[in-house]
């Protein structure tokens, strides 16, 4: 019979252990190469973040960041609340406008007499005007409160020569109110050119003046009263003479409202 030939033992491959495990021997750790240093650090220093010398500083910075974050949150909440209030106010105003359809009162000049203007002297004048203003509130469900701190001025050639105020009163819906005003000026110095121009206008019986009214008002919608608004009335009035009684030759008024 032929003899069996067994393969020879192959040397151990790279990465395989060649130690005798049966005898309990394990391969030793390789020694570090020359010029290599191994530093061992205690575990309590490795996991300590931040290090002890910076711990207090770290706590201060963390506290500041928390405070800043809280301030930002409060400020953002405040802005959001203000924005919501503005939106709600705008919606309420729009609803009231659609329900009531408000219109500004109509104004006209019913009487306008002048006294105290002497064109034959160069001395300062102290003019006086008796003015009758008619206000018509045509709104069906809206009242108007005329507040304090109003102003009424009479101008000639852009020179303020007399002034006064509107009375404080309440004008209900669908109402016509006639207001009598007494306006006066003191020591108004007219130039020679203004006196000459006035004399020429008196001869033609067309002396022009401008009346300006600024009246703070509040509007009443049912039981709701609005904030203060400003009614501005501008009237061009022409009279025939500078003594009472004078006759109105022409008149024209316009108005607008400052909501804020």
From Swiss-Prot:
Glyco sites are at 120, 130, 175
Task: Specify where the region named Disordered lies, as residue ranges.
Answer: 1-35
Q: What induces it?
A: Induced by infection with avirulent Pseudomonas syringae pv. tomato DC3000 (Pst DC3000) carrying the avirulence gene avrRpt2. Down-regulated by Pst DC3000 virulence factors AvrE and HopM1.
Q: What happens when the gene is disrupted?
A: No visible phenotype under normal growth conditions, but mutant plant display enhanced susceptibility to the bacterial pathogen Pseudomonas syringae pv. tomato DC3000 (Pst DC3000).
Which locations, inside or outside the cell, does it occupy? Cell membrane
Provide the transmembrane region boundaries.
79-99
Its BP terms in the Gene Ontology are: defense response to bacterium
Low complexity composition-biased segments: 13-24
Pfam families cross-referenced by the UniProt entry: LEA_2
The membrane topology term of the UniProt record is: Single-pass membrane protein
Q: Which domain of life is it from?
A: Eukaryota
> Could you state one GO cellular component term attached to this entry?
plasmodesma
Sorted alphabetically, the keyword list is: Cell membrane, Glycoprotein, Membrane, Plant defense, Transmembrane, Transmembrane helix
- PANTHER family this protein is in? LATE EMBRYOGENESIS ABUNDANT (LEA) HYDROXYPROLINE-RICH GLYCOPROTEIN FAMILY, NDR1_HIN1-LIKE PROTEIN 6
Role summary = Required for plant immunity against the bacterial pathogen Pseudomonas syringae pv. tomato DC3000 (Pst DC3000).
What is the name of the protein in this document? NDR1/HIN1-like protein 13
Q: Which gene encodes it?
A: NHL13
């Amino acid at each position: 019979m032929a003899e069996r030939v067994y393969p020879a033992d192959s040397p151990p491959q790279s990465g395989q252990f060649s130690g005798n495990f049966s005898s309990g021997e394990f391969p030793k750790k390789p020694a570090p190469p020359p010029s290599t240093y191994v530093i061992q650090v205690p575990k309590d220093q490795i996991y300590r973040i931040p290090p002890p010398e910076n711990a207090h500083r770290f706590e201060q910075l963390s506290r500041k960041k928390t405070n800043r974050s809280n301030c930002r949150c409060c400020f953002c909440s405040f802005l959001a609340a203000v924005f919501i209030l503005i939106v709600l106010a705008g919606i309420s105003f729009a609803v009231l406008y659609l329900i009531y359809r408000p219109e500004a009162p109509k104004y006209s000049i019913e009487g306008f007499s002048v006294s105290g203007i002497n064109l034959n002297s160069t001395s300062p004048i102290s003019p006086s005007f008796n003015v009758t203003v008619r206000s018509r509130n045509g709104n069906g469900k809206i009242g108007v409160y005329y507040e304090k701190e109003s102003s009424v001025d009479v101008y000639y050639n852009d020179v303020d020569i007399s002034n006064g105020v509107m009375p404080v009163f309440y004008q209900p819906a669908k109402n016509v109110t006639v207001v009598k005003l007494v306006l006066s000026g003191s020591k108004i110095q007219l130039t020679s050119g203004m006196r000459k121009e006035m004399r020429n206008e008196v001869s033609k019986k067309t002396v022009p003046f401008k009346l300006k009214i600024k009246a703070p008002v509040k509007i009443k919608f049912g039981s709701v009263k609005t904030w203060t608004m400003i009614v501005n009335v501008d009237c061009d009035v022409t009279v025939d003479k500078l003594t009472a009684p004078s006759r109105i030759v022409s008149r024209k008024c316009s108005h607008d409202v400052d909501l804020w």
